[in-house]
Amino acid sequence: MTYTPLEREDGTELSVRMKTITKLIYLAFTVVILAIGAVIANGAPGDLFVSINGDGNNGGGFIYEYNPGGVQSTFAAGLSRPRGVAFDHFGNLFVVTNTFDSVSQTLQVTIVKITPGGVQSTFATLSGNLKGQGVAFDGAGNLFVVANDLNDPNLTSTIYKFTPGGVQSTFGSVPGQGFGLAFDRAGNLFVTINHAVDPSELWKFAPDGTSSVFATNPDTVSAWGDLAFDRFGNLFNSTDSATPTADKILKFTPDGEESDFATGFTEPRGLAFNRGGNLFVANRSFEPPGEILKFTPNGVETVFASGIDGPQFLAVQLLPTPRLTR
């Protein structure tokens, strides 16, 4: 009988081949671990990223990164009036920026993509005299951005949709200043809308683009800001009345029941939850400088970071979805 190498009775060839296979498996596993590590190298799970207006000039803005202990570092610089921030499934951070064109006297919106290593590139630009605000990803990895029309006294806004490949389309529009965006688990998109005279509104867009009014602000003075969902499907909304310490964080149940979650803010803006269910709030509070507040699920408040010049929107780096990185 003739034996193939794998069938030798003494097992010698089998042992050699098994060692080779084991090495290959180990190498493949190492490559996967290194790939995941590369994705989160400069954005460890749980780190908080904050867009900073800075001096308000072109290139004067930043993205600050805070580890869970509140230690600050600068993740990106040279950004123009950065606003909404959001992570994709691969750990890339997308930032809405607004650059003033001194020739045309208009504001130009650019969506900047920043890799985990801090490399910046232009993902997309919007044409027109617009101001970009909130940004959010749906479950399929499509990016949504709301931008205000500065040529319209009502600041009517358009919600733009970008595929992962950067193909742009118009998802919907709202009759006022769109600000915060957030998706629920069912794929519905929520957007806050502020009006010059009428009360602020919270609109809900179904995945097919059908819109409805989810809630209306009973306070005609305050404007509604950013949005964030907790793990139970409750929606949180920052408010701004332009009166020091008079602002709130509102909580909406999935059925639309509204309550005050926290009060005593001065111009709160960005909201974000971490995996532990803690809510982070960017409180601009100009004098003294802004701060990031942290609320436990039961509402206990602490100052997470302070002395911040114009904090805007927030995003928490979560563990990337296991996919091929890009």
Give residue ranges: language-model regions:
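N-terminal secretory signal peptides that target proteins for export/translocation
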Residues: M1-T22
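Bacterial N-terminal signal peptides
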Residues: Y26-G37
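Boundary/junction segments of secreted and surface-exposed precursor proteins
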Residues: A41-I52, T321-R326
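Beta-rich, blade/repeat-based domains predominating
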Residues: A44-P45, N58-G60, G78-F90, L126-A140, ...
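Conserved beta-propeller blade signature
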Residues: D47-S51, N92-V95, N142-V145, N188-V191, ...
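Short loop/turn segments immediately following the C-termini of beta-strands
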Residues: N53-D55, N98-F100, N148-L150, N194-A196, ...
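A short loop-to-beta-strand structural motif that recurs across blades of beta-propeller domains
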Residues: G61-Y64, Q108-V112, S157-Y160, S200-W203, ...
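A short beta-strand motif characteristic of beta-propeller blades
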Residues: V71-A77, V119-L126, V167-S173, T210-N217, ...
